[in-house]
């Protein structure tokens, strides 16, 4: 049987900060329940959890759990049914769901936030939240990824957003928010994906057309993307924040990071139609 406090201490001993150790335990439990359920092909994992797993870098650890539903309803009753089924997985952990599910509506995202409590048989409990959206474009294929759940000493496969989709969704969000963006860590995610991600450029171009060029009114070419990013990157407030060390999880010079991003988008220009 899993002891939540012992599991948290396990990750602390491996070098995680307390909050991230607690979050990692919650992520392991929730994702392993999904992997062991009939919903494993109806859910794709996204966001910081994926970035942390593909980078294998504790500096990119996250407290968030973000998933998208595939061919499954986002209605509250459907979400509650999903968690009810996950609760039937016999792993010694019970999920208590706050039934006041919050509607999330942002410029580039609509979904639901579910606050949950995980309880073990030793009367320990931890809280976490899960943001749930919908994977609407079924033509955008998801990738199978092997997660290592150290709490269970096991590995299991789940669907995740591809690196290319992660990159372009972050890019689309930044273009939509412009200089008002607060997603400074995304800058360093871009750099990692460009330099280490070995992205498929043909897929990247396809997604840039879907998410950016065909979806944002003022963006018609990659030149428009470069110009908008340059405007953002030269904004004094943005520069001050993005240089904060708590966002720079890769430890690279910020000017090098920003120039690498711009150069990468520029060299895609002849390929985007």
What does each of the following model-derived ranges do?
Residues 1-43, 53-61, 65, 69-273:
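Structured mid-to-C-terminal alpha-helical surface segments
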Residues 45-49:
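Glycine-rich beta-strand-to-loop/alpha-helix junction loops that act as flexible
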